Amino acid sequence: MLTMSTLRKSDTEFHHGDLQVALVTAGLRHVEKHGLNSLGLRQLALVTGVSPTAVYRHFADLEHLKTSVAKASREVLGKMMLESLNKVSKSKTSKGAIDRFLAIGGAYIDFGIKKSNLYEIAFICFDSPELEPTSPSSWDLLMNSLNELNELGCLSDKNLKTAPTIAWSMVHGFAGLAAQGATGNSGETLASKKVVLQSVLKCLEIKDTL
């Protein structure tokens, strides 16, 4: 965890990996509070209490930093989805599987609503070969849920093929609108969120087999 004592450390007091983690954590917090456009390498050096040279040892340029902060943002998303999933019954029934599917979809939308600045950066750069896969992975959570629905007979083999793209697109699109404040007040957004999630079920013909 990044603490005030960590922020006061000199360059030499950081282990190589520790400084990189501290920089990404500081960048993540900065973006969440102030937005993507204010993120900068020199500003990050000031916040973490190290020299600009130390920052450049880890991030060659601003785009490199943004890529790492984007990955960290996606991990926040994955954790939100996993936390929501863990609050739902683990019953191996069709209703349980549908509830879990709705839980991760709802958490994805909540990420856009509650952490709009992180949503903005999360998917702007995610194809760098230097990055390890995110953990937990929001994509893996989606695929696991869809496969479970298919195994329980709630989702047909035919629809399973297109389900990932359709489900992701619908939820991601609404989350993006919510992140921009384009879905009305909190009550209107919540109502629309429920409609979108039910629309995903209908579009994919996901049914409770009882």
Q: PLM features: what roles do these ranges have?
A:
Residues 1-18, 88, 208-210:
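N-terminal intrinsically disordered/low-complexity leader segments
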Residues 110-144, 183-186, 190:
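Short secondary-structure transition hinges
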Residues 31, 66-73, 80, 122, ...:
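Alpha-helical DNA-contacting segments of helix-turn-helix folds
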Residues 82-115, 167:
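Hydrophobic alpha-helical connector segments
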Residues 98, 102, 106, 139, ...:
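An amphipathic alpha-helix signature
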Residues 19-28, 44, 69-73, 77, ...:
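Generic hydrophobic, amphipathic alpha-helix propensity
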Residues 22, 26, 30-64, 68:
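Helix-turn-helix
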